[in-house]
Amino acid sequence: MNYVLELKNKRFIQADKKNKGGGITMNSKVDVTVTHLDTLIKQLSSIQEFWQREHKLFTGLLVSVHYNKIAAKSNRISGLFKGIHSNDAVVGAKFNDDKSKHIITYFLEDKDLTNSIELLFQVRVILNEVYTGRMSKNILENAEKVNSNIFKNYPISMSVFKSVIADVSYIESFQVHQPKLIKSQSIVTLYDVKKDIKELLEEIGLDPLHVTILDDQTIYLTDTQVQVLFENAAYLVAMATVDVSQLPPDEFIDTYESYRITIPEPTIEPTIGVIDTLFDERVYFSEWVEYHDMVSNDIEKSSLDYNHGTAVSSIIVDGPRLNPWLDDGCGRFRVRHFGVAVGKSFSSYTIIKNIKKIIANNNDIKVWNISLGSSYEINDNFISVEAATLDRIQFEEDVIFVVAGTNKSSEDVIKIGAPADSINSVVVNAVTKEGLSTAYTRRGPVLSFFAKPDVSYYGGSKDAYIQVCEPNGVQSVAGTSYASPWIARKLSYLIDILGLQKEVAKALLIDSARGWEENLDPNVLAIYGHGIVPIHINDIIQTKEDEIKFLVSDISEKWNTYNYGSLSNVGVFTLRVFFGTNHMYGWCHSFCSKVEYVL
C-alpha cells in the first residue's frame, strides 16, 4: 500500500486567458418576428402600468423574464434593461414547472423599463422596414445583410439592434411574479430591493419589533403576518416555506438487548459536534459526551425524545464495537451533543437560531453531525433556508457539517429534504450491507445540477441493521441518520488527527468513494452520490501498490469561465502506474478533469 502524498509550498499560477469571449449570439432555433416584438412591448407596457398603479414600498420595480430555454449567462439580457450590466440586477432565479426553462427576476429602475420599451419599438421599425418582419441567426451574422450602413438613418446603432434581437430570441415573456398564499407560520425570503428590511416591514404594515429577522432578506412570520404580507406586497416574496418540519421515520426492531458494557475514560480524542434530539446521560458512554439541552423548559419532553440523539452519538463514540463489521480503524471520539429538538416535529426557525448560536460558541469543533431533516421534499427552485444557513456558517466559521440524506416518510416522497440540500455540507445517503440503495433512501439532485447526496454509507436495512445504544439498551435501527455519523468520524480523523484542511478532507473522501469511475449515470449520482465510502480509514489515506495519490490545494484568486466543468482550489490526483511503459494514467477528483502524465 502507498500513502497519500500532500504537495505543499508551490502556489497555483493563473494562466493567461486566451479566449476573450464571443460576441452577440442569437438563438439559432428561434426567428425573431414583429409579432413577438409586439407581444413583448405590450407585456412590458402592462408591467409599467402595474407599477405605476401600485403603491410601491421601494424605489424601483421587479420584472420576471421567462426565457425559452435554460439560459446560460451569455444568453441572458445584455441589450435591454441595464445593457451589459443587466446580470448585476438579477435578484432571483428559478425553473418553470417542467424544469425546461429559466425564470429570472430583475430589480430595475423605472427608466430601465421605459428605455427597454423604446428600444423594442425602434428594433421593431427596423425589422419591419428592412428585414420584412423576421430575423434569423443566419441573416443576423451575414455582414452583407446586417452592416452599419443600413443603420445610418435610424436612431440606434447596429450593435444595439443586434443585442436586442439576440435578447428577444431567448425571451418567451415578461411578467410580475405573484406567489401563492401560504396559510401558516412560515420562513419567508424577500427580494433584495435595496431597502432596509425594517423599513420595508413597516411599509408593509408589520411591526419590525414583532417580526423575527433571520438575515437581510429572510424573516420568520406567524400565519397572521403572512396574510398581511401577501395582501400588501406578495410580489416581494422570493421564497416561502412552512416552518414546522417532521423528522422522517427510521426503521427499527422493537426489541432491546440490555447488557452491561464498559468503556475506558476519554483522554485526548478529538471532539465531534452533534446537533440532534435529546441525549440520555445514563448510558454507558456518557463520560464521552458533553451534553447541552437547548430545548425550552416550557416544552414537554417524553422518554422517546432521547432515543434518536443518543443513538447517533453512540455511533460516533463507540460505533465499531457495536458494529464490528464496520470497524473503520478511527478509534473512539468524544462528542459535544446539543439537544435542539423533541419528538417528530420541530421548528425550522428554532433549529436555525440554535445552530448559529452553537457554532459561534464552540469554535474549537471543526466537524459537526446533523441527522435531523425534513419529511418534506426540497423546492426545485430554491436552496432551503436551513441549508443556506449551514452553507453560510461553514464559509464564515471554517467548519464542516455532515448531514443525513433524510428518509422517506411515504412512497410519494422522492427528493431529499432540508437541510440535505446544503451545497457545502457532506450529505450522506444510506446503502445496505450489500451496497444497494435502501427502501427509505431519497434522491437528489439539488436545483437540477448540484450533485447531492455527496456519498453513501451503510445505514442499515432488514438484511443487516445498525446496532446503536439507546436509553433502554442496544437497538437495531436503519436510516440515513445512522449512516452520516460514520462519515463524521472519518472526516474528524482526516481533519483533527491528520491535520488536513476541511476542503481537502472532503475531496479525499469523495475521491475514495468515486474510485476510477469516470462518468457516473445521473440516476446513480442522484441516489448514491459519488459512491460508497470505504469502511476502513486506511483505504482512504492509502492507495494500491500500482497507484500514487497526491493532494494539492491553494486559493484560486482568478478564474476563467467555461461552458462545461468547474474549477476549485482543491485537487485530489490519483495516478495508476503501468510498469514497463513511460506513461502514468491519472484521474483527478472531484474538482478537476482527467489528466495523463508523460514521464
Predicted regions and their residues:
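Autoinhibitory propeptides
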Residues: N2-P264
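Subtilisin-like peptidase catalytic core
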Residues: G23-E49, E54-H55, I70-F81, S159-S163, ...
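Subtilisin-like serine protease catalytic core
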Residues: I261-D293, I299-S348, E396-D398, S422-N424, ...
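Extracellular S/T/G-rich loop segment that most often corresponds to the catalytic His/Ser-adjacent loop
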Residues: D276-L278, Y284, K415-S492
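Substrate-binding/access-modulating region of protease and related hydrolase catalytic domains
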Residues: A341-A418, S476-A478, Y482-A483
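C-terminal subdomain of the subtilisin-like protease fold in secreted/lumenal serine endopeptidases
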Residues: L498-V570
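A short beta-strand element within beta-rich, extracytoplasmic domains
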Residues: N569-C588
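Short coil-to-beta strand junction motifs in C2/discoidin
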Residues: Y585-Y597
